């Protein structure tokens, strides 16, 4: 009986991660030069802005929002601008501060990215433009770069 009680106590203090919900928080599309843009030779240049933010909700629940903003130009003219805010609610318990930061800053965005990419691609094709095939993003590398940038900024302010 004692072994079972210890197992239950250990399980309660063990790290826990659970995806509760994935949803589109915001979605927008603009094609300012349509329909004239459709008659031009298509030579696009794609600009991608990526951002994440985290919000602590009630007890152990966190919202992570991944924002992808794409601006596609054909020559010097903007063909379209598309943006999606893909969000998720995650239950995260019993992690130390560094693990929690990594989970919210890299692991959760990795989960959200395929959903955001699909939402953008669907939006773009519904606007009658060619499919937008975004390459995978290495959120672990981006997270490491951000940590390094913050550490460097902290060292510069101390000096």
UniProtKB/Swiss-Prot annotation:
InterPro entries: SecB (IPR003708), SecB-like_sf (IPR035958). Keywords: Chaperone, Cytoplasm, Protein transport, Translocation, Transport. One of its GO terms (molecular function) is unfolded protein binding. Its main location: cytoplasm. Belongs to the SecB family. One of the proteins required for the normal export of preproteins out of the cell cytoplasm. It is a molecular chaperone that binds to a subset of precursor proteins, maintaining them in a translocation-competent state. It also specifically binds to its receptor SecA. Homotetramer, a dimer of dimers. One homotetramer interacts with 1 SecA dimer. This is Protein-export protein SecB. SUPFAM superfamilies: SecB-like. One of its GO terms (biological process) is protein folding. GO terms for cellular component: cytoplasm. Pfam families: SecB. It is found in: Cytoplasm. PANTHER family: PROTEIN-EXPORT PROTEIN SECB, PTHR36918.
């Amino acid at each position: 009986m004692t072994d079972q009680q210890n197992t239950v106590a250990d399980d309660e203090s063990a790290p826990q991660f659970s995806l509760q919900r994935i949803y589109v928080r915001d979605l927008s599309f603009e094609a300012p030069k349509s329909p004239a843009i459709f008659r031009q030779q298509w030579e696009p240049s794609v600009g991608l802005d990526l951002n994440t933010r985290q919000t602590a909700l009630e007890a152990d629940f966190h919202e992570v929002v991944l924002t992808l903003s794409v601006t596609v130009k054909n020559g010097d003219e903007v063909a379209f601008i598309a943006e999606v805010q893909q969000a998720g609610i995650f239950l995260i318990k019993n992690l130390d501060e560094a693990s929690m930061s990594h989970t919210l800053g890299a692991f959760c965005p990795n989960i959200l990215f395929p959903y955001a990419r699909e939402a953008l691609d669907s939006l773009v094709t519904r606007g009658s433009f060619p499919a937008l095939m975004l390459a995978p993003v290495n959120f672990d590398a981006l997270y490491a770069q951000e940590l390094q940038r913050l550490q460097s900024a902290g060292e510069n302010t101390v000096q």
